[in-house]
Amino acid sequence: MNLDKRLNDVQFSKDWNLSRNISIPDDVIWPAYAAGSNIATRKVWGAVIEELAGKGMFLVGGSADLEPSNVTEGFAKLVKDFSKDNSSGMNLAYGVREFPMGAINNGIALHGGLYPFGATFFVFADYERPALRLRAIQKLPCISEYTHDSIYVGEDGPTHQPIEHLMAYRAIPNLL
């Protein structure tokens, strides 16, 4: 069926236009928190992507094997994994592959029609850095969620503490 015929379908046409313009649907109910609430930003992020899941936002993405820690597992359960057996899944189970995650998201953004995101710990963003740099240069519409960003984070010690990362990423034009 060609696109002109599909665009005559009211729902398809609405979804098509929404995906081409990457706009937020009117029926989104944003999570609300009281000022001063002691809530981790990753939990707010999780609530936001769960609300956007299935709202016609065409949000696609996933985590580099850290779904419970960066609070993307709710989204994954709602939209299901993309796989050879489920091409309608919107969760991309990247595994321990930050660079491919970034490169894939860039490709999705360049193609258009979907709004990609990827999530990992901030300390692992260095593995994604070449893709992030290209994303910033091209001003691509992608979201990167970096959690556990404190230099005092975690029982894993210095290997999981992003001490120099924020300064390095601020130096990339258009990134932040």
Give the ranges of each region predicted by the language model.
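Thiamine diphosphate
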Residues: M1-L176
